């Protein structure tokens, strides 16, 4: 991809893609990483423009109106940390594996989502922005106050995931 992303990963991918295109005698076409995510729903559906998109990745959290190829309107975004970062940090605090998303999901299915009341930042604001830094801090505080038993991990994962859903979908 042409960006955005981690510079080392982009450099390796760019070098490989250029060499591969040359070896195959094909043109090299740079693609924006986020645009790839934004257009992926059209790969296996007859989705028409415009459509709403919730774009969540390791470094980005946005609501977009996809108007057409290359034309996007940002309706909301994170004002601090990306959701993927919050999932990875929570998984790390709970001593789960990486990437955090699948690990949190696995534990959350067996936990009590109502055990821990975590903050819902910006939920009453009249915009579509997110904030996940406070949620990460709240999880860290609760983890520091408890023994990290399997039950605790399941309940915290469920509470975290439930809270994230409340933030995104309210």
Put a short name on every predicted segment.
Residues 1-18, 22:
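Short beta-strand-loop/turn "lid" adjacent to the catalytic site in phosphate-handling enzymes
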Residues 1-6, 32-38, 60:
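Acidic, glycine-rich active-site loops and adjacent beta-strand->loop/helix elements
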Residues 9-10, 40-43, 65-68, 76:
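Short acidic, glycine/serine/threonine-rich loops at helix termini
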Residues 17-38, 78-80:
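Short, acidic/small-residue loops that bind anionic groups at enzyme active sites
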Residues 18, 22, 40-44, 92, ...:
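Short, well-ordered alpha-helices that flank and scaffold nucleotide-derived cofactor binding pockets
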Residues 30-52:
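Conserved phosphate-binding catalytic cores of ATP/NTP-utilizing and phosphoryl-transfer enzymes
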Residues 48-49, 54-57, 62-152:
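A short helix-loop
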Residues 159-170:
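Phosphate/ATP-binding catalytic cores across multiple sugar-kinase/actin-like superfamilies
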């Amino acid at each position: 991809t042409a960006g955005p992303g981690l510079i080392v990963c982009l450099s390796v991918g760019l070098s490989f893609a250029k060499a591969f295109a040359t070896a195959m005698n094909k043109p090299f076409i740079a693609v924006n990483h986020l645009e790839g995510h934004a257009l992926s729903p059209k790969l296996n559906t007859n989705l028409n423009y415009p459509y709403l998109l919730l774009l969540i990745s390791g470094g980005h959290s946005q609501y977009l109106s996809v108007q057409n190829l290359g034309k996007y309107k940002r309706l909301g975004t994170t004002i601090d940390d990306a959701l993927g970062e919050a999932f990875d940090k929570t998984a790390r605090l709970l001593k789960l594996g990486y990437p955090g998303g699948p690990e949190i999901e696995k534990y959350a299915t067996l936990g009590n989502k109502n055990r821990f009341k975590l903050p819902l930042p910006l939920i009453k604001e009249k915009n579509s922005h997110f904030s996940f830094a406070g949620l990460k801090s709240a999880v860290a505080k609760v983890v520091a106050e408890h023994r990290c038993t399997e039950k605790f991990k399941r309940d915290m994962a469920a509470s975290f995931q439930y809270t994230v859903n409340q933030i995104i979908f309210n």
